[in-house]
Amino acid sequence: MKIGIDIGGSHVAIGLINGNGKIIAKEDQDLNNDLRSKDYCKKLVNTIIELITKILEEKKIDIKEISLIGIAIPGTVSETHIIKAKNLHIKDFNIVSEINKYFNIPIVLRNDAKCSAIAEKEYGSLKKYDDALFLTIGTGIGGAVYLGGKLLKPKKYEGFEIGHMVIKKDGIKCNCGRKGCFEKYASMKTFKDRIQSKFNNKNLTGKEIKELLTDKYYQKEIEEIIDEYIEDLSIGLANLINIFEPEVISIGGGFVHFKDILLEKLVNKLNKEDMLFNNQAVPKIITAKLKNDAGIVGSVIEYKD
């Protein structure tokens, strides 16, 4: 058995995975909002250790039965280090050695979008496609690309920073230090922030936001927010489609929870003739089959470059 860890911008999820790629036990926890604190990395590792220990104890499994721990995290990583994870304010942190202090077993560290894409290719929405683009849209935006059935992989570091493609010159400043990044306009965090700002309520839950989106009383205000969001999202996707011409785009992350409201509008927008250089190249747009579990599952899948 293996343990998959998915570290997101606001929470960490850990799953116990059997030989068939199925999650048989899962624990998750929200992360401390004080991301800039000096001991944040230590707290993150402690949270991971606690959740792993809880799963092992509940399932009555000895750590010796675990052959691998996989870690999926947004940002740029090496085999051992989180080189840069801007949304988590982590830089040059050897997370592998820290976890190995508690569990001395092999650990694989990968970019989260890449992990999700691998899982969707193996078990989910990308299984029958050779040329595909996977996007994870949540706190930020990450992505991975399959061309000719092979995962496109940078030579030096893990990571394919789609979210930091500039879509608006001199736009909003991003956590990365640049201005106008894709994820500052089209992440689910931005979408939710716009709704909370419009209704002057920063404490709206995901459930309350979904209820607002279908409330006819606020239809005009909601349509304005959705149209603006779809416009920004489609600009970034159109750029990627023009470059890679994928057969399909699969979207995971928090976007999946709002697919009934957003997906059809996105497809309609991309089908407009002025969005793409080749209007015959519009790919199929779908959502991730494994939903938010893709990162956990993909973190432990062995694959060949």
Predicted regions and their residues:
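Glycine-rich phosphate-binding loop of actin/hexokinase-like ATP-binding domains
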Residues: 127-185
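A charged helix-plus-loop insertion that forms the helical arch/lid used to bind
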Residues: 82-91
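Active-site glycine-centered loops adjacent to acidic/histidine catalytic or metal-binding residues
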Residues: 112, 138, 299
